[in-house]
Amino acid sequence: MKIIFATNNAHKLKEVQAVLGDGFTLVTPREYGVTEEIPEEQETLEGNASQKAHYLHDRTGCDCFADDTGLEVEALGGAPGVHSARYATDGHDFAANNRLLLRNLEGVANRRARFRTVISLILGGEERLFEGIVEGRIIDRETGHEGFGFDPLFVPDGYDRTFAEMTTEE
């Protein structure tokens, strides 16, 4: 089954394709002529995922899905949350985001955090929302080279390595 995934992020595309396996072929918006940046203007992960999926579906008429993920840190009242990609700057500057997160957690004992992802899937014109949560903690320095974003700082519960140290299969 071919489905449009609302991302032009090569890392994310690779990760999701590996999870979905051979039964699905992910294609990018560009492959369907959607070259502009897809808007993310909502104040919730659910709102952003839904907005992106509907934007693609309205322009292509094809089955599609979109996600929005936020890192929610307990000691920061759930921040950066929906603003994770633009935590430190208006752009997607992962290094700046990680530096700001570490600065904001200096001297803070409670490092509990979670990644929360919301997926909006539109099949046959009908939308379904899904949510996934990974609980964990933030360490005090970046470790690992895989993944992207906050992955070098996040250790999921039950592991002693960051997401950036794990393989896609893990």
Where are these regions (language model features)?
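Anionic-ligand binding patches
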Residues: 2-4, 10-170
